[in-house]
Amino acid sequence: MSSNPAPFSGTLASQSNIVSGEHQHYFFGATNTFTINTGETLVAYVYLDPANLPSEVMVQWKDFSNGWEHRAYWGANNISFGVAGTNSRRFIGPLPPAGQWVRLEVAASLVGLDGQTLNGMAFTLFDGRATWDHAGKATP
């Protein structure tokens, strides 16, 4: 989509449907992979719909050695993937502010991704709607 909200970067962003409960969009099996180096930070830009606020936002990463067992979440603990307090479901903080673009940041080490190569990501919500834009990594 290209408006409501305007993308954070480029000309298009990906917006979820308005859904009750757990919902997500994702990709895996990417042939254009990237490696996470020690000390890097994983980032994703999200815009939470203030009229349809989710109670939880989760980002998931898929690597070649441990699959989808790398997750970080913000807000309530409603999404059942992984084990709380581990690399498979790490609480990062409260739900980000709604109605503006927010850069989500997760130290790769918090979700067990230092030195791993990614081939998939998932953008998961509980209730509500969000728009997602640039996702990748940042080097300190």
PLM regions and their residue ranges:
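Short carbohydrate-recognition loop motifs
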Residues: 1-26
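Extracellular ligand-binding interfaces
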Residues: 18-113, 117, 125-139
